[in-house]
Amino acid sequence: TATEKYPTLRTHRLGVGIYTLTDDHLTRTELLDVDIHDERTPIAALVGHSRGDLVLLNDSDLTYAKVRLDDHSMATLIDRIDALSDPLARALCWSSAWDMCRDAEMRAQDYVTLVGKGLPSETDLTAVTALIRQATTAAISYSNAEDRQEVRDRLVAILATGLRDAMPGSDHQVAYANGLATAATTDAADLLKGWLSGEEVPEGLSIDQGMRWRLVTALARVGRVGEDEIAAELQRDNTISGSEQAAGARAAMPTAQAKQAAWQRATTDDSVPNETYRQLVMQFIQPDQTE
């Protein structure tokens, strides 16, 4: 498609893959390369053809395109994306699903369910980190207010399971721990607070200074730590980085006084360093702080 303002349609070479669930694997059974010229391009070779369980447009990633998954294909992925062994095909499905979620064409809870199904079988750290980040954004920012707590609880359960199953001391373990801290609600606050004092820390997980600030900020966001605890952490990490993180933790607190102080500092104090300003802005708005 093209906008009315810029109606130019360019030719694309597009792969159309047909995948069928066989012996617990989503296997590609057909691949057609199609040249797209117009707004609609009939594909005669597929007329009367079995649609399979998944139809993947732009299979093999031949062109730069924003594609959509049909309802049947999406239902297949939500149920069995872990059966799609081809990493490129799986990456294309992840990309399409995230585009649909961001464009309000896929419910946030369905995206979180999809991530929960496929995340355990992903081994690439970049993919794991991106999926955790995107699922967290979907749960916190894109879900309906009335469903948000349920969606976040589901995500927290997914991340807790991933953390439990991750290899001790691995980067994947850190990715799950970071995600859990970011997505955590008040129900997980006791666990996170325990990590700060060395209690029930998963085997191999290093609670270094970076992780400590992530935990402090998460706890500040849900009102489980306040100014005294943030000041104590800053005394422990009396560095420029510590000062920046403390500013963010204070801005995350769910009180009118904390928000007013952060707002004033961000909008009226020209001496605020760039990274401190970034922390203030990043932590100021929290979707779960609606009052």
Regions found by a protein language model. Name each.
Residues 1-4:
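Gly/Pro-rich turn-and-neighbor structural signature
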Residues 6-9, 19-32, 42-291:
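Long, ordered, helix-rich scaffold segments
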Residues 13-16:
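Extended, Lys/Arg-enriched charged tracts that mediate electrostatic binding to polyanionic substrates
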